[in-house]
Structures are given as structure tokens and as C-alpha cells.
């Protein structure tokens, strides 16, 4: 009589199937969460680029104004130098933001498993 053995095998197969379903569902949820987090990071990085671009433009305008003030003698070299330093920092922050944006796009591409950016037509 193999009734109990057969019943145990059936139950074991059912449990294994259910476990596989749960593992698959857990993996789907993990992947979905990873993709959502990567997408939110891209959105945040894009907003950072916009903010840093505006800051860079303001610093550029401030340097232009300070240069003109220095030219007509109503500003000191120290003030001009400070405006140039602020402009350089704003340029650097903008470049860092651009780099961060591309990093976040690469992370999103890795999460979804496909390339999201188009090729530029170059040799790369």
C-alpha cells in the first residue's frame, strides 16, 4: 500500500509549487520597487539639473554685472573675484548634476533591463 507515500508526494509537490509562486511574486515586487526607486531618482536628478542650470545662469549674470561694475570703478577686485568663484562653483554644481542625471538613467536602464537612451550616431 503506497497511499500515504503518494499523498505525501502530492502534498510536497503542491507546497513546492506554492513556494515557487511566492518566490516569483516576491521577485516581481522587488523588481517593481527597484524600478520605481530608480525612476524617482531620475526625476529628482532631472529637477536638480534644472535648479543647477538656473543657479548657473544667475551666477553668470552676477559675474557679468560685477565685471561691468569693476570696469567702471564701482567694485573692487575682491568682489569681482568672489563673483568669479561663485560662477565656477555654479558651473561645477551643474556638471555634477548632469553627471548624476546620467548615473540615474543608467541605474534605471539596469533596473528595467533595456537601453532607454538613443545612440548619438557616434562610434560608441
Please give the residue ranges for each predicted region.
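Sec/SRP-type N-terminal targeting helices
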Residues: 1-61, 96-99
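Amphipathic alpha-helical coiled-coil scaffold segments and their short linker/junction regions
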Residues: 5, 43, 118-124
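Short, electropositive, low-hydrophobicity segments enriched in small/polar residues
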Residues: 7, 77, 117
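Short leucine-rich amphipathic alpha-helices used at interfaces
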Residues: 47-50, 107-108, 114-116, 120
Amino acid at each position: 500500500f503506497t497511499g500515504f507515500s503518494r499523498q505525501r508526494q502530492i502534498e510536497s509537490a503542491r507546497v513546492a509549487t506554492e513556494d515557487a509562486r511566492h518566490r516569483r511574486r516576491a521577485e516581481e515586487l522587488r523588481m517593481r520597487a527597484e524600478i520605481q526607486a530608480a525612476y524617482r531618482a531620475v526625476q529628482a536628478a532631472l529637477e536638480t539639473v534644472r535648479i543647477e542650470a538656473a543657479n548657473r545662469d544667475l551666477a553668470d549674470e552676477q559675474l557679468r554685472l560685477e565685471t561691468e561694475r569693476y570696469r567702471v570703478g564701482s567694485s573692487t577686485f575682491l568682489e569681482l573675484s568672489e563673483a568669479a568663484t561663485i560662477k565656477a562653483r555654479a558651473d561645477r554644481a551643474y556638471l555634477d548634476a548632469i553627471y548624476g542625471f546620467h548615473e540615474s538613467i543608467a541605474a534605471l536602464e539596469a533596473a528595467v533591463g533595456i537601453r532607454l537612451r538613443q545612440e548619438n550616431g557616434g562610434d560608441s
